[in-house]
């Protein structure tokens, strides 16, 4: 209802400039009606006239749009009368006697506050008649009649009795004027009408007022609520008017109540109207009881008694000054008179019927609303009518009553309330309403208004006890609301709305004395709804009764408290009935403005009335209820819960959504029941702008300025305010018409109430149990649902405003410290499923100096559990035997499927049959089991589902389980129970008889060659045999069409239940894709339904029923196979899939594999992606379950069993899903299964020659990452402590061991990069740290000696240059200790290069063996260059040795062992040192860069010894000490000697001398060795190192010469070596151990040296391989060729250091020790063969080469000593740069030799010179064999191999530095 429309009679713009204008306009707008005038004059007459006119007027209104339009046209005068005195107003408005109405209006206007005018308070004078116009306009064109309110003084216009006087005046002829006035400029019209009304009220009020009072007492139950808004306005003009209208009306109401009972037809115009229209309308809208009650009451309201009743019941009168006395005086009588008036209602029953026709339907009422929406009055009416469906009448009656009651009723019971209630309760029978007349105080009316308030609530009478119910949605705290609620199904609040609506509606429609009040109530009442309606109706706007009181400022004020209580119901009521009124929110602004005025007026009066509303004050926001839809708890007003005025201000439609609904909602119904009253409310809302102003004007006396402010606020607040007390309701006033904005809920009455209730909002709060304390005006609780839930109706949600957000269960903020203190049970999950949890138990603990324990939370026990124990994996899924591969899994798969089927069948519907209706889920459950069974058959028969009798039978049993027992003769008919096939109805399917004429026609057509016509002629005559035969033979293209026709007409005609058979025929006829149309017709799939034209056809059935016959259809097709029938099966699957039957569809797809695509989700052609999962219809669930993946894997497995070429081995798109499954398994702790899936995926990816796009890198990476994580995760615990071996593990272990032994890798050195020989937690430790901790022996100390004199812990430090030695993670391994030390030695050498090594030091080789054996004293460990313990002032001994010692705890690591005698050599060693430096990087010690580079070279080969004991002391390497040995040592250096030689080197450096004899023979080769050493010249590095160390350079020269010789020897040896290598390989391949043995045979003689020079051993093995007989030499720890001569053994023992690139660098260093004590060393060399031969290391230099070399290196120099005397021997030995050599095998021999020679031979210098040579040679050999391996352990290993190759090369004898050495070359 467009309350604000400028054309509205109440609209400010439409207000008349003068009363004359109003009259003119009214006359123009509405033709005066004599009956109306009569009615106006006499209350009884008015009542009758009201009934009549109500009929007419309501008919118009009922018509809705027309009447509303008229109402709009009749600006204020028409609408105003109707609202003013519900019936009377209607009568003037409808009757059309504008003059009468206008006359009445002037009189009333005098009495009535001009504030009642529709115009805003500021715009309109208190005498404004717009109020009445609004009501009338709201109802219909009679708004001109509504002008009677304008002709009535403002006081009369108010909902208070003064409005009644105008009705009387109107009855006398003012009605016609009243019709005219507002048609003019709204402002002028209003002014004119006001003036006229005042004058008329003054003149006619006494008589008319009495009559009006009588009728109004009855009608005003409805009208008063409306009028209550008016009374507020009247309060401005009409204390007198109110008195006239109120007291006189009360008297007349009392008198006329009885009279009206007699005069229903006659009496007061308003009474008649009220009776007729209101009662008729209410009776129509409401139940018959409501109609009767309305009839009974409406006469009284017509007399204005209803107004009193409303005020009394609603306590609304408190809002109006005039109403207070009226309510007090007349409320009780009115309650009684209401029954008298009810007879009028009976008279008006005709109107009721009309109203029923017009408004009985919510939609019709909504229609009115739109019409009213059209005009200002119409808008109000439409808004009101919109809500009238459920709450309009209630609002009219209830609003009026609520105006009376909600004010008093919210918390109080008013006698008048009950009486008014019946009238007001649109949906409550008026009879019921009257039953509650107890409260006499009009302002404390029982909740009776509440009961009627809700239009949709039954019009159960609301007793005074029901005041709280006044609020249709949430009666405040009043008990009565419950009864009302009982009727309404909600709270009493709805009844309040009914009353207001009934009365308001009458006022609105019937032209109550203060129709403007109703509009104002509609608008203002919204505000009051915020206050009163909120009190009555939490939804506020819905409580019309609540609204009306506000218009009466005084009375309303006193009543608002109750009303405030009522407003909650009112608010609720809007939610329920006025949700349609929510639109009234739209006009609500007007109403609220109007009601704001009313509340303002009310506020002064509430002073007296507050007591009733004491509780209601909370509901001051009741105004919002007005705005709130009747059915939605005044959502708009929610924010305005605290103040009704704000909500009312907003146009009734202000809560836009509610406004539209208001018309359809309670307002509509209110109109239907109480046209005038409700119209009044509607008009008020429409007028919200001007009407509110009117109310302000009228209320000005009471509280004009405040109201005025509220008016402005109301539009905004009104919308919110409706939800004030019940903001939730305002919020709830959704767009639903039942949830109109609370303001629109009970527009008129609520608005009126809100005014008073604004003051009384707190009382409302108190009063309305449903609406807790109203939230602040700005507070908007969440919107309430628009449903009619009890909460919505009663305003239960209104309570929400108090606490919109429920308090958290815990008072502590989650982030508060206290909250954090609560115990928690953290849980963490590891990558592979363990879950770690711990609690925080409270434990008593004693603090210091405390005698009492304090209970504190301390870390609890940590519990580690497997996640599968906590969250077990579903057993059926966990037992899946996947990944499925090979026929071995077939049995397990079938067993798994069988178990799954059994478990699934347990959950099936108990009584399933094909004909039993089941839900979609039940059907899918059955089909799911079928899918599992089909898969089991698929696997059992190796991927075959058809083609052999066994499979066919198995499938048939699944698809047609009852087929076997059926009679074979009638399998489909008698067996129809199973198939749903043809039934007896099929008997009707008979082809037409063959007529001779038809056959003749066919014959002729065939003769003419027109076979197509012949075919169709036969088909048309149902000669299907002819047609099919001809088409098949002559026109194959027509055959399918003819077959379709035959199937359609003869097989699958409607009702035959032959869908499956028809589908089979379609398949057989070749219509594969179309055959499924027989199951589900195409029109059904398109969502259409066809209507059969056959009269005999059976009743239509669900077109989807055929879909349930898919199993039967599939069985028919499979049992009758035809060409390409797979396409039909596929089509059937597609059809099923389209209807969400995934399992059934996949069964079909499995049978049509050749026509179905089983592909990825990204492939649009894929029919299914995962078996049992719908990727189209249920994409959100797709792939989220594991079962479909498992079924898909089973399907894939079945395909693989089929073995057909067309069947892919794997379905690539499943790889990602399998990975997902693997992850799930891992998460649940099934590590091994997850690994198996990863392996299967990886295999599938690599097995395909052409990679599938699904096997992309991302998938590969994900699989690889998961595999790595799973492998690192702990294995699942086994039941036994004994590991369960597997063949793979056993075979892998055996072969790995064998291969390692053959290759020499498994010597246990662990120096290899992998350190395989040293399992354990330290196996991967880098930096050369020993894998296994050594005993704290001197050796270890020696290793560290450099840094820490004897302990050299730093040598062990991995952080040092260890990296160089580190190369062998296990460099520390017994054989490779030296190698790692190389790094250390490098570090040390640089520093300690100068530090003399004691002759006792061992060479690196010694160190290696030292690692093998428990090293001797650190001194011995130091043997050679690396006396780590030797505090030799290595520049940075720690750094030097650190790496190496780390790698090798063994002596080598202590490269810096101080070799006392070798000290001189150390200077030479520096030359060698450069090699070590390079190797370990210990150069930090001060080793020259050159050294560093060399050291690296050494480290690879002889990583064990790598660093000469001194930073640059490579010469100290024993290898170099003995010319040959150095060579050997060099090759062996880190890799060879380091790891492997150690064993041979076990003997200490002193032992090698025992091999001296071998060394001597080697002397022959010395030259050659020297020759071979020239190659080491390639060791430019060595030279560089020497350059770096000037001292070594002099030695280098001699070395160069020797190297040249050695190079030649090496070359020769290399050739032999190459041959031997191949032989070794062949031997290795041929007879396994022989290759081993071969390797060892050659080494036999040089066992010790060779072992050290593991690398040379390989070549040696090759040579030995050539020899056929081998034996294992325990001393050499090798297999030795029996046939091999001593030379061979020597060769083996003294393999040159070719591979040791590092040695070469060492040799460069040895250059410094080159003091050619070589000869001395040479002597020592033999011992290495013998002594060292035992030790593996000596083997590397078996011939004593190491010894001799070392000795040669420096018989007197530390280098030579280091080389030859590795430990104890002369200092020169220590100096020997043999470090690199030492690392190979040379070190041990050198050690040995060194000891013997170095010590004895003391040829420290010679050895040193030799060592350099050998080093250089070895480096050259390395070049030949390959670049020296990295300084890392791995490289060292390789170096060992290289050394072996060198050994293989044969034995080379030569002299280095005057020392003979033997070399295998």
From Swiss-Prot:
Cell compartment(s), UniProt: Endoplasmic reticulum membrane
Chief localisation class: endoplasmic reticulum
Family: Belongs to the SEC16 family.
Compositionally biased intervals (Basic and acidic residues): 344-359, 498-510, 683-697, 1594-1625
Protein's recorded name: COPII coat assembly protein SEC16
CDD domains assigned: ACE1-Sec16-like (cd09233)
Matching Pfam families: Sec16, TPR_Sec16
Gene3D superfamilies documented for this protein: 1.25.40.1030
Biased composition (Acidic residues): 270-281, 360-369, 387-400
Composition-biased stretches (Gly residues): 1309-1318, 1790-1803
Compositional bias of kind Low complexity: 85-99, 213-225, 553-585, 613-632, 1362-1377, 1539-1557, 1701-1710, 1735-1760, 1811-1833
Stretches for region Disordered: 1-166, 193-820, 1301-1339, 1355-1665, 1681-1842
Single Gene Ontology BP annotation: intracellular transport
Entry GO terms, CC: endoplasmic reticulum exit site; endoplasmic reticulum membrane; ER to Golgi transport vesicle membrane
Entry annotated with the keyword Zinc: no
Membrane topology of this protein: Peripheral membrane protein
Listed Pro residues bias regions: 469-483, 724-733, 773-784
Record field: compositional bias (Polar residues): 1-10, 41-51, 114-123, 252-262, 744-760, 1330-1339, 1382-1393, 1442-1474
Membrane is among the record's keywords: yes
Keywords for this protein: Autophagy, Endoplasmic reticulum, ER-Golgi transport, Membrane, Protein transport, Transport
Protein role: Involved in the initiation of assembly of the COPII coat required for the formation of transport vesicles from the endoplasmic reticulum (ER) and the selection of cargo molecules. Also involved in autophagy.
């Amino acid at each position: 209802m467009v309350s604000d429309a400028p054309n509205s009679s109440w609209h400010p713009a439409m207000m008349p400039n003068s009363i004359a204008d109003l009259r003119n306009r009214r006359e123009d707008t509405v033709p005066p009606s004599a009956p109306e005038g009569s009615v106006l004059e006499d209350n009884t007459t008015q009542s009758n006239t009201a009934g009549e006119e109500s009929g007419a007027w309501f008919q118009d209104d009922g018509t809705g749009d027309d009447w509303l339009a008229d109402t709009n046209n009749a600006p204020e005068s028409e609408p105003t009368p109707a609202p003013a005195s519900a019936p009377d107003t209607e009568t003037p408005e409808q009757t059309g006697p504008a003059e009468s109405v206008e006359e009445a209006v002037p009189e009333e206007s005098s009495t009535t506050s001009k504030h009642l005018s529709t115009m805003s308070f500021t715009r309109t004078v208190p005498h404004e008649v717009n109020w009445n116009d609004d009501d009338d306009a709201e109802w219909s064109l009679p708004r001109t009649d509504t002008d009677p309110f304008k002709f009535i003084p403002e006081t009369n216009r108010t909902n208070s009795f003064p409005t009644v006087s105008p009705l009387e005046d109107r009855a006398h002829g003012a009605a016609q004027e009243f019709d005219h006035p507002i048609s003019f400029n709204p402002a002028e019209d209003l002014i004119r009408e006001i003036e006229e009304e005042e004058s008329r009220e003054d003149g006619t009020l006494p008589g008319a007022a009495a009559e009006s009072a009588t009728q109004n007492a009855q009608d005003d139950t409805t009208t008063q609520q409306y009028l209550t808004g008016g009374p507020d306005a009247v309060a401005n003009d009409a204390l007198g008017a109110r008195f006239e209208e109120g007291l006189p009306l009360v008297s007349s109401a009392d008198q006329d109540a009885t009279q009206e009972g007699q005069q229903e037809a006659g009496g007061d115009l308003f009474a008649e109207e009220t009776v007729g229209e209101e009662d008729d309308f209410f009776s129509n809208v409401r139940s018959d009881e409501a109609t009767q009650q309305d009839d009974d009451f409406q006469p009284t309201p017509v007399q204005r008694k209803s107004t009193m009743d409303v005020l009394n019941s609603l306590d609304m009168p408190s809002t109006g000054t005039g109403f207070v006395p009226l309510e007090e005086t007349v409320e009780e009588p009115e309650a009684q008179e209401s029954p008298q008036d009810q007879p009028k209602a009976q008279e008006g029953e005709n109107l009721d019927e009309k109203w029923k026709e017009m408004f009985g339907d919510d939609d019709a009422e909504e229609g009115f609303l739109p019409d009213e929406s059209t005009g200002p009055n119409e808008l109000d009416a439409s808004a009101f009518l919109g809500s009238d469906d459920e709450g309009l009448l209630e609002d009219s009656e209830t609003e009026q009553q609520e105006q009376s009651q909600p004010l008093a009723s919210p918390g109080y019971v008013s006698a008048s309330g009950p009486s008014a209630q019946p009238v007001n309760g649109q949906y409550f029978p008026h009879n019921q309403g009257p039953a509650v007349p107890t409260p006499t105080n009009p302002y404390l009316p029982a909740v009776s208004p509440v009961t009627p308030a809700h239009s949709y609530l039954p019009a159960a009478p609301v007793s005074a006890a029901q005041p709280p119910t006044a609020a249709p949605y949430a009666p405040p705290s009043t008990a009565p609301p419950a009864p009302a609620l009982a009727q309404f199904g909600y709270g009493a609040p709805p009844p309040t709305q009914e009353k207001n609506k009934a009365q308001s509606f009458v006022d609105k429609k019937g032209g109550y004395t203060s129709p403007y009040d109703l509009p104002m109530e509609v608008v203002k009442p919204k505000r009051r709804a915020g206050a009163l309606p909120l009190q009555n109706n939490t939804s506020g706007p819905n409580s019309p009764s609540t609204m009306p009181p506000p218009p009466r400022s005084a009375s309303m004020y006193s009543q608002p408290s109750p009303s405030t209580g009522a407003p909650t119901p009112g608010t609720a009521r809007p939610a329920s009935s006025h949700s349609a009124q929510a639109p009234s929110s739209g006009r609500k602004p007007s109403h609220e403005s109007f009601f704001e005025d009313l509340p303002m007026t009310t506020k002064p009066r509430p002073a007296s009335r507050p007591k009733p509303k004491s509780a209601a004050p909370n509901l001051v926001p009741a105004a919002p209820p007005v705005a709130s839809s009747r059915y939605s708890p005044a959502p708009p007003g929610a924010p305005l819960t605290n103040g009704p005025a704000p909500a009312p201000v907003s146009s009734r439609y202000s809560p836009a959504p509610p406004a539209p609904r208001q018309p359809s909602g309670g307002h509509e119904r209110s109109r239907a029941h109480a046209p005038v009253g409700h119209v009044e409310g509607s008009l008020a809302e429409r007028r919200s702008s001007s009407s509110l102003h009117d109310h302000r004007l009228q209320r000005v006396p009471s509280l004009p300025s405040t109201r005025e402010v509220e008016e402005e606020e109301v539009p905004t607040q009104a919308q919110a305010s409706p939800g004030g007390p019940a903001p939730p309701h305002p919020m709830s006033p959704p767009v639903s018409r039942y949830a109109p904005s609370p303001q629109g809920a009970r527009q008129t009455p609520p608005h009126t109430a809100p005014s008073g209730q604004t003051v009384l909002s707190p009382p409302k709060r108190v009063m309305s149990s449903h609406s807790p304390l109203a939230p602040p005006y700005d507070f908007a609780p969440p919107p309430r649902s628009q449903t009619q839930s009890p909460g919505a109706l009663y305003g239960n949600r209104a309570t929400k405003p108090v606490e919109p957000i429920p308090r958290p269960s815990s008072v502590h903020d989650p982030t508060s410290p206290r909250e954090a203190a609560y115990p928690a049970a953290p849980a963490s999950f590891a990558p592979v499923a363990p879950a770690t949890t711990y609690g925080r138990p409270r434990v008593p603990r004693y603090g210091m100096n405390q005698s009492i324990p304090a209970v504190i939370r301390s870390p609890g026990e940590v519990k580690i559990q497997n996640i599968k124990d906590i969250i077990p994996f579903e057993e059926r899924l966990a037992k899946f035997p996947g990944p499925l591969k090979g026929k071995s899994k077939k049995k397990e798969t079938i067993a798994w499927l069988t178990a799954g089927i059994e478990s699934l069948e347990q959950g099936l519907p108990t009584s399933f049959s094909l004909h039993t209706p089941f839900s979609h889920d039940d059907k899918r459950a059955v089909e799911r089991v079928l899918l599992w069974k089909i898969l089991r058959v698929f696997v059992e028969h190796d991927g075959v589902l058809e083609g052999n009798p066994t499979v066919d039978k198995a499938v048939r049993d699944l698809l047609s389980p009852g087929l076997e027992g059926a009679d074979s003769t009638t399998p489909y008919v008698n067996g129809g129970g199973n198939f749903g096939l043809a039934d007896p109805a099929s008997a009707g399917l008979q082809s037409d008889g063959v007529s001779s004429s038809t056959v003749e026609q066919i014959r002729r057509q065939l003769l003419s060659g027109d076979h197509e016509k012949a075919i169709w002629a036969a088909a048309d005559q149902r000669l299907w045999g002819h047609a099919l035969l001809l088409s098949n033979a002559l026109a194959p293209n027509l055959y399918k069409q003819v077959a379709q026709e035959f199937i359609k007409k003869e097989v699958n005609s409607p009702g035959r239940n032959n869908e499956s058979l028809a589908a089979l025929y379609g398949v057989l006829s070749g219509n594969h894709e179309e055959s499924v149309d027989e199951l589900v017709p195409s029109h059904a799939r398109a969502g259409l339904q066809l209507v059969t034209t056959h009269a005999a056809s059976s009743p239509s059935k669900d077109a989807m029923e055929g879909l349930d016959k898919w199993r039967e259809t599939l069985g028919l097709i499979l049992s009758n196979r035809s060409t390409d029938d797979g396409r039909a099966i596929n089509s059937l699957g597609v059809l099923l899939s389209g209807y969400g039957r995934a399992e059934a569809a996949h069964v079909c797809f499995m049978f049509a594999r050749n026509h179905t695509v089983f592909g990825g989700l990204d492939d649009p052609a894929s029919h299914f992606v995962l078996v049992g999962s719908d990727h189209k219809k249920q994409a959100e669930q797709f792939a989220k379950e594991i079962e479909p993946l498992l079924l898909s894997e089973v399907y894939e497995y079945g395909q693989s069993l089929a073995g057909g070429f067309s069947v892919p081995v794997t379905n690539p798109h499943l790889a990602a899903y399998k990975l997902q499954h693997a992850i799930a398994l891992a998460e649940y702790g099934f590590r091994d299964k997850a690994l198996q899936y990863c392996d299967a995926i990886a295999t599938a990816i690599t097995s395909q020659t052409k990679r599938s796009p699904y096997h992309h890198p991302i998938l590969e990476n994900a699989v690889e990452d998961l595999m790595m994580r799973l492998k690192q995760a702990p294995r699942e615990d086994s039941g036994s402590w004994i590991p369960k071996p597997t063949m793979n593990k056993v075979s892998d272990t055996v072969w790995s061991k064998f291969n390692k032994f053959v290759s020499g890798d498994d010597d246990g050195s662990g120096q290899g990069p992998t350190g395989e020989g040293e399992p354990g937690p330290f196996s991967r430790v880098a930096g050369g740290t020993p894998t296994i901790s050594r005993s704290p022996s001197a050796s270890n100390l020696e290793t560290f000696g450099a840094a820490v004199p004897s302990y050299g812990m730093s040598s062990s430090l991995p952080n040092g240059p260890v990296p160089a030695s580190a190369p062998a993670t296990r460099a520390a391994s017994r054989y490779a200790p030296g190698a790692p030390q190389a790094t250390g030695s490098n570090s040390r050498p640089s520093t300690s290069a100068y530090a003399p090594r004691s002759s006792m030091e061992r060479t690196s080789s010694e160190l290696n063996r030292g690692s093998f054996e428990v090293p001797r004293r650190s001194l011995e460990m130091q043997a050679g260059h690396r006396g780590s313990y030797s505090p030799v002032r290595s520049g940075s001994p720690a750094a030097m040795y650190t790496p190496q010692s780390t790698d090798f705890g063994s002596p080598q690591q202590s490269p810096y062992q101080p070799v006392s005698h070798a000290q001189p050599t150390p200077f030479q060693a520096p030359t060698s040192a450069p090699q070590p430096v390079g190797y370990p990087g210990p150069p930090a010690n001060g080793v020259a860069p050159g050294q560093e580079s060399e050291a690296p070279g050494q480290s690879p080969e002889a990583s064990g010894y790598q660093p000469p004991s001194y930073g640059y002391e490579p010469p100290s390497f024993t290898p170099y000490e003995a010319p040959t040995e150095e060579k050997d040592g060099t090759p062996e250096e880190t890799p060879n000697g380091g790891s492997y030689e150690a064993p041979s080197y076990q003997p200490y450096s002193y032992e090698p001398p025992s091999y001296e004899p071998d060394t001597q023979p080697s002397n022959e080769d010395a030259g050659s060795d020297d020759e071979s050493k020239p190659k080491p010249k390639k060791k430019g590095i060595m030279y560089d190192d020497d350059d770096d160390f000037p001292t070594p350079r002099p030695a280098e020269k001699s070395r160069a010469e020797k190297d040249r010789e050695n190079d030649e020897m090496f070359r020769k040896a290399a050739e032999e070596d190459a041959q031997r290598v191949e032989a070794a390989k062949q031997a290795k391949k041929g007879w396994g151990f022989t290759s081993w043995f071969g390797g060892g045979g050659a080494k036999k003689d040089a066992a010790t040296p060779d072992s050290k020079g593991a690398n040379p051993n390989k070549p040696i093995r090759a040579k030995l391989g050539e020899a056929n007989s081998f034996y294992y030499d325990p001393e050499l720890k090798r297999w030795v060729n029996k046939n091999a001569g001593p030379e061979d053994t020597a060769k083996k023992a003294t393999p040159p250091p070719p591979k040791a690139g590092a040695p070469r660098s060492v040799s460069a260093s040895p250059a410094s020790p080159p003091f050619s004590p070589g000869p001395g060393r040479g002597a020592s060399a033999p011992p290495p063969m013998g002594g060292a031969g035992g030790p593996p290391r000596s083997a590397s230099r078996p011939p004593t080469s190491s010894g001799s070399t070392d000795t040669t290196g420096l018989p007197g120099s530390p280098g030579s000593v280091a080389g030859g005397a590795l430990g104890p021997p002369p200092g020169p030995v220590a100096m020997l740069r043999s470090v690199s050599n030492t690392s190979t095998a040379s070190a041990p021999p050198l050690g040995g030799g060194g000891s013997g020679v170095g010590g004895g031979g003391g040829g420290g210098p010679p050895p040193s010179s030799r060592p350099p040579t050998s080093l250089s040679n070895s480096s050259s050999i390395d070049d030949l064999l390959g670049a020296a391996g990295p300084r890392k352990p791995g490289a060292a290993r390789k170096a060992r191999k290289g050394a072996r190759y060198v050994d293989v090369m044969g034995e080379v004898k030569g002299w280095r530095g005057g020392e003979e050495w033997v070399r295998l070359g």
